[in-house]
C-alpha cells in the first residue's frame, strides 16, 4: 500500500454565528466516492483529525475522498445543537463539493457517513435525517434548531449511499450509559468540581454563555467523560430525558437507513458489543465484522493487525455494495 500525501484542503461553514470546519483529503486518482468522517469522544472530547494516517491512506488508495468534519462539544452545547451542526456541516460540504446532480442530470460521487464511537451515533442520526427527507418523511423532525446549512434543492438532493459505523450506538438511552461503568470506576475518581472547572463559557468566568468548542483535546477534556461514566450521568450531560428519547433511532428508523458496515470488539468496556451486532441485523444489506477480546477503540493501536483488518473489510464491503 502506497502512502498518499496527506495534504488537506480546508473549508469553513457558517453555523448560527459560529464556524464549523472541514478538511478534505483527495486521492491521487479520480475519486469513486466520498466519505464524511465524524470523530469519537463521547461528544465531550475529541478532534476531527484523530483518524490514524494508515487508515486515511487506505481510503485514499482505494479512490475515496475523505471529508473530516468537526462539531460542537457537550456539555457546553446540547444534543440539538450538535446534531444540527452535523447536518449543517454535511449539507454545506455537499454544496461546496458538488455532490448534487449537474446540469446534464448525471449524478456526482456517492457519499457515505463514517463515524467511530460517538461519531458513529452522529452518522446514524444524520442518515436518519437525510434519508427521512429523501423519502418524504419528516427527517428534520429529529432536530429542533434552525439550520444555517445551504439548502439543497429537491432536484439535486441525494441521500447517503451507506454507513461505516465503528463501535457505535443508536441511542444514549441504554442501561449501561445510565449507571456507573465498572471499567471507569477503576480509574482515579473525578470530582464534580473538576468537571465544573473544565466546562467553558464564551468569555471566561464572567460570562455564563456556553462556549462553542469544536476541538477538545483528550488531555484536557477526557476527565469530563470519566466523571460521566463513573457516575452514570453521561446522558444528563447531553440533554434532558426528552432530548435523549427524541434523538434516538426507533425500529421504524432502521428501515429508512442505508446499508452499513458495523464493527465492534467483544471486549469493549465502554459501549455494548450487542449494539453494533443488532444494528447490522436491523438495517437491510448491512454487514457485521466482529473483533474479539480487544478494547473499545480497537483500531487506535495501529500496531495491532485487527484494526487494519477491519478497515480492509469495510473497503471490501464498500466495493460489494457499489456493484450490487
Give, region by region, the residue ranges found by the protein language model.
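N-terminal cap/lid segment of alpha/beta-hydrolase-fold proteins
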Residues: 1-30
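The serine-hydrolase catalytic nucleophile loop
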Residues: 45-55, 80, 274
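Short amphipathic alpha-helix adjacent to the substrate-entry channel of hydrolases
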Residues: 49-67
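Primarily recognizes the serine-hydrolase "nucleophile elbow" in alpha/beta-hydrolase
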Residues: 95-190
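Accessory cap/linker subdomain of secreted extracellular hydrolases
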Residues: 166-250
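Short beta-strand/loop motif that positions the catalytic acidic residue
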Residues: 256, 262-264, 268
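Conserved alpha/beta-hydrolase "acid-adjacent" motif
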Residues: 269-275
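Catalytic histidine-centered segment of alpha/beta-hydrolase-like enzymes
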Residues: 294-307
